[in-house]
Amino acid sequence: MTIRVGVNGFGRIGRNFYRALATQKAEGKNTDIEIVAVNDLTDNATLAHLLKFDSILGRLPQDVSLEGDDTIVIGDTKIKALEVKEGPAALPWGDLGVDVVVESTGIFTNAAKAKGHLDAGAKKVIISAPATDEDITIVLGVNDDKYDGSQNIISNASCTTNCLGPLAKVLNDEFGIVKGLMTTIHAYTQDQNLQDGPHKDLRRARAAALNIVPTSTGAAKAIGLVLPELKGKLDGYALRVPIPTGSVTDLTAELAKSASVEDINAAMKAAAEGPLKGILKYYDAPIVSSDIVTDPHSSLYDAGLTKVIDNQAKVVSWYDNEWGYSNRLADLVALVGKSL
């Protein structure tokens, strides 16, 4: 069965999702997923140009053009390009036979708003961000076993939660987490200013390419949604840094059981080669952020940075906050599509 997908919001994540899915399909994975339509407020000529040319991912190898004013042609693939401004309920998902909507505008993250996609004829909605009042938040490899097909509005959490989740799961399963604090050293995003200017967050008001910008992250608290046993036990913040992609999570946790550096690294390696294969990757090489750009894993564990004092452990994991997350988005569409 083909899983027909509509994408609402063809920005950084929407376009990365398209490219990640195309890469997976070329490798023989998730070949039953078809993107049939995208919707964005931006004109379609601009969308086609930004899909073809990408400052991080480079040029798309296929030719990209417009057919008429409502179809983007990518190689021999045609995608309906909508410009519906009235909100999810006004989208023609029913007429287009869309099964799953990827909601990636960053606007309709509340379930009441996202429900408009269901009213418009879609069967499932996946929000590519932390959400409110959603039926379930899923981090693949951590709690995807909780999806039973009855949930219609699903959050794929954040890129940082997708990195932190596997780390926290392994630590908690093997040694127990009493409490912990995390920092994500995160690439800048569109929610920051290129130059100093007004912003509701006065730190993010400052020039993104010139500063290390401390700001909030909900990733640590969101862990409680996917690992309920850790609810209220983790907290942290983000440091936005002047790079376009490639981020890293630093977690310091008090463990219930004492463990050595070797114990922790062995547990992470076993998980990366076993139940979390494809989600968690184990590195013992001395890598830097550019080394993990376009790596499809959610979390790339850096064994050389593990530290332990008594029962306090520090673990570090890298992630491509765009590409890794977009690959999980494609995998979540596949999981949800199987229940249709």
Swiss-Prot record:
Show the GO MF annotations.
Answer: glyceraldehyde-3-phosphate dehydrogenase (NAD+) (phosphorylating) activity; NAD binding; NADP binding
Question: Which PANTHER family does the entry mention?
Answer: GLYCERALDEHYDE-3-PHOSPHATE DEHYDROGENASE 2
| Assembly and oligomerization | Homotetramer.
Residues holding NAD(+): R12, I13, D40, K85, S128, N321
Q: What is its EC number?
A: 1.2.1.12
Q: Does the keyword Disulfide bond apply?
A: no
| Name of the molecule in the record | Glyceraldehyde-3-phosphate dehydrogenase
Taken from the UniProt entry, a GO cellular component term is:
cytoplasm
For the ligand (D-glyceraldehyde 3-phosphate), the binding residues are S158, C159, T160, T189, R204, T217, G218, R240
Query: Which positions are catalytic residues?
Result: C159 (nucleophile)
Query: Where is it mainly found?
Result: cytoplasm
